[in-house]
Swiss-Prot record:
It is found in: Cytoplasm. Keywords: ATP-binding, Cytoplasm, DNA damage, DNA repair, DNA replication, DNA-binding, Nucleotide-binding, SOS response. ATP binds at G30, H31, N32, A33, Q34, G35, K36, T37. One of its GO terms (cellular component) is cytoplasm. GO terms for biological process: DNA replication; DNA synthesis involved in DNA repair; double-strand break repair; SOS response. InterPro entries: DNA-binding_RecF, DNA-binding_RecF_CS, P-loop_NTPase, RecF/RecN/SMC_N, RecF_2. It comes from the Bacteria. Pfam families: SMC_N. This is DNA replication and repair protein RecF. Signal peptide: none annotated. One of its GO terms (molecular function) is single-stranded DNA binding.
Length: 374
């Protein structure tokens, strides 16, 4: 898919801007604090309805204003689709084809974007929460069912945890309601677990090939889904539900004593194995970076496989974080395949040579100038 046009109105430091993009590589270049990341963020928000930098939508609205608008046209194999998001103190409204969507979950999936920022290089060495967030964010874009199930799971988890605390401090005594909450939680949790198993298996296939290539055939990569149920590719949702519900029943007293839910996909993780060794514990920084890069690039192919369309790729200041070999791999892997937006304060010679006919936009104080490419 291609984002042909973007319009920003009172979004962050952009007053009123309409920009037409290159279907290939778009370079957003400028000094610090001019609005490069804000532009990538706008595309990301147009894709997922929320920002990767803040959970407070109000921050997206220009400080002098009361509302903001992001709109754009996405071109897919089925045709052109106009998308629009409005933010105000009353909340946000999402429109597809000029029609307001009753639920944001109906909107997500129209425009898919993969964001790669320097912090993604710590996907491997960062906390398990980072990897769970990664799974939820990426798999939600590929499957509205996943988005729904993960959302329901989160809501029920909050309810169950609140109830467990009330039982712990004896503000409640009725365990029947706890059983009902655990039953529902196990049902949505099982859906999330089986979907993660499925998506990670496919992601592994793509990532292993890329990793081998980037490491010049020296390393093999495997991805293991770490979960308390130890599911395999053959485990059904029903089996996972039964197993998870049993864990809740068997550990009811422990969960009450701890005032929190101990089992479920909110405790999952991903283990990355390079040449069969856990790269988080034993890998060099370079191996960890190669792993993160392979996994990010693999997402592009996974998304194409699952949705039939390539996503957009948003690269926020990552080139400067990668050495020449990894830069070369990244840039050759995306050329002529995915529409790419990359921010940088200066483009290295390597990148200039590798990028095919980019459009270069110079950003200064929330305005854009197109640079003629020499
Ligand atoms: N809600 C807002 N209203 C107005 N201006 C904002 C708002 N939010 C952020 N800004 C301004 O946007 C600018 C930051 O833009 P951005 O994060 O895109 O920088 P950048 O060009 O990516 O820089 P760097 O290279 O340092 O990452 C800052 O000047 C900040 O003050």
């Amino acid at each position: 898919m291609i984002l042909t046009e973007l319009h920003l109105h009172h979004f962050r430091n952009y007053q009123d801007l309409t920009v037409h993009f290159n279907p290939g590589v778009n370079v957003l270049i400028g000094h610090n604090a001019q609005g490069k990341t804000n532009m990538l963020e706008a595309i990301y928000v147009l894709s997922l309805t929320k920002s990767h930098r803040t959970s407070n939508d109000h921050e997206l609205i220009n400080w002098q204003e009361k509302s903001a608008l992001i709109s754009g046209t996405v071109e897919k194999s089925i045709g052109k689709i106009p998308l629009e998001l409005q933010f105000s103190s009353k909340g946000k409204k999402a429109k597809v084809n000029h029609l307001e969507q009753a639920r944001l979950s109906q909107y997500v999936g129209q425009l898919n974007a993969i964001l790669f920022a320097p912090e993604d290089l710590s996907l491997v060495k960062g906390s398990p929460a980072l990897r769970r967030h990664f799974m939820d964010r990426e798999f939600s874009q590929m499957s509205s069912k996943y988005l729904y199930n993960a959302g329901q799971y989160r809501t029920l988890l909050r309810q169950k945890n609140k109830y467990l605390k009330q039982l712990k401090y004896r503000q409640q005594t009725d365990r029947v309601l706890l059983g009902v909450l655990s039953d529902q939680l196990a049902a949505f949790g099982a859906e999330v677990i089986i979907a993660r198993q499925h998506f990670l298996k496919h992601l592994e296939g793509w990532a292993a090939d890329l990793h081998q290539e980037i490491s010049l055939n020296k390393e093999s990569l495997r991805l293991e889904y770490v979960n308390q149920l130890k599911v395999s590719d053959d485990t059904t949702v029903e089996e996972a539900y039964q197993a998870l519900f049993k864990l809740y029943q068997d550990n009811e007293q422990r969960e009450i004593e701890q005032g929190t839910t101990i089992y479920g996909p909110h405790r999952d993780d991903i283990r990355f194995l390079v040449n069969d060794k856990n790269v988080q514990a034993f890998g060099s920084q370079g191996q960890q970076r190669t792993t993160a890069l392979s996994v990010k690039l693999a997402e592009i192919d996974l998304m194409k496989e699952q949705t039939g369309e390539y996503p957009l790729l948003l690269l926020d200041d990552v080139l400067s974080e990668l050495d020449t070999i990894r830069q070369t791999h990244l840039l050759t892997a995306i050329q002529n395949k995915v529409q790419t937006f990359l921010t940088t304060t200066s483009l290295s010679d390597v990148a200039r040579q590798l990028i095919n006919e980019p459009t270069i936009f110079e950003i200064e104080h929330g305005t854009l100038n197109k640079e003629e490419v020499k």
